[in-house]
Each structure stands twice: as C-alpha cells, then as structure tokens.
Amino acid sequence: YLIELETSSTITSGLQSSLHVFGGTKFHATTGTPLAKLVDIQYQPAGDAIVENRYGKGYTIALAADLIGSIVLIQQGIPVTQDGQPAPDGSASIDDDILKTEDGFVLNWKWDRTPIVPSTQPVFLEPITDELRELIVKAILRCFEVKSQSTPILWYYPRGLKSIAMMSHDSDHNDQQLAWSLLNVTDQLNIKTTWCIIYPGGYIPEFYQKLQDWDYEIALHFDALTKKTYTNWTQDDFNYQHQWLIQEAGIPTLKSNKNHYTRWENRLEFFHWCQAKGIEVDQSKGPSKHGTIGFPFGGSHPWYPIDDNGKRINVLEINMLTQDLVITCPVFYGRGLIDSVSRHYGIAHFLFHPAHIEKPNVRDAVIDVVEYAHLQGMEWWTSEQIGDWEQKRRQIRIIHQRHDRFTITSPISVGSVTFIFLIPDTINDFSIQIDGRLIDWKPISIYGCNFAEIIIDIAANQEIKVQL
C-alpha cells in the first residue's frame, strides 16, 4: 500500500483510495524528496514509494510499485476455478457454489473498503485503479511542468464531458408488462439504456422494435447459471444464445453482453468467446453481493483485457457499480458512487432489473440516480455508444514534431473530440493555433493542473497542425 502521501505535491494530492499495489521494487532513497511511503499487506514499513529528485537541469520521479501490473491484476483478477473467500463481516458471502467474477477479485476486505456514510457496511467506495492511473498521469505532467513545457492529452469523452453514466437492464424472467413499465420510466427521463436479454423466452416483437425505434440497445444476457439446455458455461452454448437473440430480436448484430449472475470461469476465456462473435463490450465485472458494491475490480474507467501474450483482447469491459438501488442497497448509495466516478472522470454503470420496477420506491430510485448524474454533468449512454466511442477515440494519433508543435490525425472522421493542453505555471501568455489560425480555448483544472481545453472535428486522413 502507498501511505503518507505528500498533500502539497500535485503528484500525490487528492487521492482517497487505499492505493493497493502488487509487486515492484523496494528502495530507500538517500537523496531527493519522498512523496509517499510503502507498507506491506500487514502495514509494516517497506521503504519509499514515490521520490522526486532534481540533479542539475534534470528531474526524476521514482515509483517503487508496479503500477501498471497492479492495474491489470486488479481489473482482470485471478482465474476463477473455485469460490472466493467471503467477507469476514458477513457482508459478501461469495462462497455460494456459483462461480462468478467476484471469486477472482484480489482486493482486501479490510483495507480496501470504506462505508459510504458512517455506521453503514463498508463497500469498495474508492476506485483504486483509477487513482493508480492518475499517479502515472500526474507524474508525467509534473515532468512537463518542471521543464516549463506543455503537452496535449486526448480526453476521454467528446464535447468536453468530464464523466458519463450508463444504465443496463437484465431481463430475468422476461415479464413483458414489467419491461413496458421500466421502458416507460426511462423514456420519461429521456435517457437511452441497454437491455440485456436472457434465453429462453424473450419479449414480443413489438417490444424489440420499440427499443430499436427509440435508440435503445439490445444486448445479450448470457445464462450459464441455470444449466438447462444451452445454458452451461461452454462456448457452444454462448454461441447458441448469441444467435438465438439475433433471430429473436430481428437485429443484424449484437455489440454487448452481461453474464447472468455475473457468472465467470477461468480468467480470459470468456473475452475470447466474445471477440470471436463480434461482441465488443462486456459488463459482467461487478458485484452480486452487498459487500462488493462499488469498485471490486478497481475502477470506473472502461478497459481492454490484456492476453497472456501481452496483446489486447478487443472486448471493452465496463465495470458495474451496483444492482437495483432499494433492493440491494439504500438509494443514497447511488449518489455516493456517482460522486466517486465524477471525481475520477469515469463511467457510472448502474443495473436495474425490470423484475423490480413495480416494487416500492424502485421507480423513484431510478429517477433519483438519473437526475443526480445529470446534476454532475453526466450524459447517459448505452453500452454500444461507449464501445463505439472508445474504438474511434483510440484511432486518433498525436505526433510530436517538437515541444510546441504537434499533428493530429485519424483514419476515420471523429466529431467533437476533446483535447486538453497543459499550461505550466511559468507560461503567462498561452495560445493555440490550429492550421495557422488562433483559436479560443477554455481554461479548466484537472489532476491538480491547469489546462486549455479545445473541441475539434477530425476529418478522415487529414492532418491537423497544432502550434502552441
């Protein structure tokens, strides 16, 4: 764990999670300024964690922990081959004879959870991997600041959005009347959501058509729990259910999936199943118990799994925060989780089952979480929208010509792309030129630094020249 963070440094200020890390190099600095200390799992001293040092005109930041390896391990977990260890306080009995994503999580029940408000059961309230990423980003930004240089950053979302929200619905039991009831609620709220449909049964054709006409997403809810015909944890059964839903809903393709009861086995095989069928987004990593609510897989940012050979598997994972406010946990949990996501510029993914929409206070809970997210400036996107945007965003390239000149290119057209440019404190007259023309920019503060924000459209295969 990283502890005793120096709050006066932009690198280590503002971090609230336990900063649980795995692996790295132990050292005790004999020169420089320690910004954080390292302790082992028993909270015994293990050396310095972060040290900055100046030597002549040079500047270094030493990070003892393997931050990238820690992020990957927390996100992907260990292979799920047996039940995980339950929470000692009884809040998460994950030893339920059902193999699921939580059985592979690696965080600590004691040190990595905190209550949303005092006197409530602890949950994974703070996104640890988000903050480990921020440490890396802020260390790099600090190096640029020390050298009085700017650098461009391709922001996470279009139109200057700082974070977004997503709502999914698992169609368990496929009750048509309850489905209409939930659709009516989200339609009145003017948000688009993702419907994960479970085999067998489904809904009437008119319902699927309404979802398509109103720009909702139809996704798969892979059932490997009931162990009836075609509902076992096999690639063949996954393929069968995938094809069934395409025919059932009358759609050409499926882009997203969430596993029923967050079922999971082994480590990466399911991502390969998804990739083979063209599923580009999965939503299965998340809590099935009260004590694992929040960020048991570390973060609010979507991520691509890394295969054992080091290559990316092209299936974006969007972690789920909680299921069914009111049914699973009090309504105010939703606001607390949104606050955590907002602080880290991530995605707040909530699951509401149609099966619960007519139960007392559930409808009001949906309304409350939607309206509160809007107050934080979040838009509600479908899983498919998030996946499509991330695919587009990752094709954009920034090429450094020299310290104040850059080119931006993309093989496809992408609209309303957000870029932010670091403004070091030593620069008093900051300006941005695009293709030789001065443009207006918006001052913003992110990661404890000052930035200039611009929003531009990028045409396919056209070079945009940027000069600062």
Residue ranges and their predicted role:
Residues 1-58:
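An acidic, glycine-rich "communication" segment
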Residues 162-165, 175-177, 184-271, 276, ...:
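Metal-dependent polysaccharide deacetylase catalytic core of the NodB/CE4 family, i.e.
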Residues 445-468:
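C-terminal beta-strand-rich structural cap/linker in extracellular carbohydrate-active enzymes
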